């Protein structure tokens, strides 16, 4: 059975003053609470990729969804930086991608991670674009620290519980059940993992998304996403913290036309928390709008930046 591990990619060298900069961080010690009370969870130094641009323009920050990573937005970030001249930041959430693992996992602590990172990089106030889990993190960040968020884009997610439409618990269980022998070629290991996942997850696009987390470390294939933490805190990830304050900045809820994640019944809560919210639907797109309709996704962001 595969287990998660802390798998790191070596940092690339900088590409000059106008190229991307990369950050790779060591594993940071978690709080003594382990997410179960006691000391407060501490922020982690997140892994990120920053594309250079005009400092006078608000930067665009992309936050990925559950099981994702900053690489989900690589192509879109490059295009957006070229077309708008803005700095574009993509970030790995804790327990995802190249960011450190921690037993602490909640929207409050993921928001705190960003409250530490964004000012350090000199990127505030910024435009925050969050998909799914990243969208909930972005919404909470805007509610808690509105001075950090110039405007907000929540991609196919709303500030309510998501359990009715998601299959994330099934995905976690399927990933934990994968069994791959050591020392196999990468292509063979990926094929075997896909075959085992397919017995539970019929959607090939979802399987391919999950398999981006399969990495080889010392001849063993492991999940780089922290499945233990996700399993323990999945209920928190599918929920959204109760808040009384509102974010008064410009807000766009970008919805997939074929997705059921944002329901009309969510609109009152959306408008309570985000009174300036606009709704825009991308036709023929599912939950992963940026993957299904990348050009429409970019066009929607650019239209909202004007």
Swiss-Prot record:
Ubiquitously expressed. Highly expressed in small intestine, prostate and thyroid, while aorta and colon tissues exhibit weak expression levels. Residues 23-33 have a biased composition (Low complexity). Phosphorylated. One of its GO terms (molecular function) is lipase activity. The keyword Mitochondrion applies. GO terms for biological process: lipid metabolic process. The modification N6-succinyllysine is found at residue 78. The keyword Mitochondrion applies. Gene3D superfamilies: alpha/beta hydrolase. Its EC number is 3.1.1.116. Residues 19-40 are annotated as: Disordered. It is an enzyme of class 3 (hydrolase). PANTHER family: PROTEIN ABHD11. Belongs to the AB hydrolase superfamily. Catalyzes the hydrolysis of diacylglycerol in vitro and may function as a key regulator in lipid metabolism, namely by regulating the intracellular levels of diacylglycerol. 1,2-diacyl-sn-glycerols are the preferred substrate over 1,3-diacyl-sn-glycerols. The enzyme hydrolyzes stearate in preference to palmitate from the sn-1 position of 1,2-diacyl-sn-glycerols. Maintains the functional lipoylation of the 2-oxoglutarate dehydrogenase complex (OGDHc) through its interaction with the OGDHc by preventing the formation of lipoyl adducts. This is sn-1-specific diacylglycerol lipase ABHD11. The gene is ABHD11.
């Amino acid at each position: 059975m595969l287990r998660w591990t802390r798998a790191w990619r070596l940092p690339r060298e900088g590409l000059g003053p106008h190229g991307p900069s990369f950050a790779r961080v060591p594993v940071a010690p978690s709080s003594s609470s382990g997410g179960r009370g006691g000391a407060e969870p501490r922020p982690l130094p997140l892994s990120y990729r920053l594309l250079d641009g005009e400092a006078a323009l608000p930067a665009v920050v992309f936050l990925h969804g559950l099981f994702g990573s900053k690489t989900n937005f690589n192509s879109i970030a490059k295009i957006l930086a070229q077309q708008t001249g803005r700095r574009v930041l993509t970030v790995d959430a804790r327990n995802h991608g190249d960011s450190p693992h921690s037993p602490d996992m909640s929207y409050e602590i993921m928001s705190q991670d960003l409250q530490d990172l964004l000012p350090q990089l000199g990127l505030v106030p910024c435009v925050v674009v969050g998909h799914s889990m990243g969208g909930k993190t972005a919404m909470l960040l805007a509610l808690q620290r509105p001075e950090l968020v110039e405007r907000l884009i929540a991609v196919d997610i709303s500030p309510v519980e998501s359990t009715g439409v998601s299959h994330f618990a099934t995905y976690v269980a399927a990933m934990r059940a994968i069994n791959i022998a050591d020392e196999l070629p990468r292509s063979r290991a990926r094929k075997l993992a896909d075959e085992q996942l397919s017995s539970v997850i019929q959607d090939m696009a979802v399987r391919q998304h999950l398999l981006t987390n399969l990495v080889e470390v010392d001849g063993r294939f492991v999940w780089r996403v922290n499945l233990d933490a996700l399993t323990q805190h999945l209920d928190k990830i599918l929920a959204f913290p109760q808040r009384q304050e509102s974010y008064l900045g410009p807000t766009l809820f970008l919805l997939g036309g074929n997705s059921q994640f944002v329901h009309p019944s969510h609109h009152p809560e959306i408008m309570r928390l985000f009174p300036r919210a606009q709704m825009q639907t991308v036709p023929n797109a599912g939950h992963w709008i940026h993957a299904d309709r990348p050009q429409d996704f970019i066009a929607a962001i650019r239209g909202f930046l004007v």
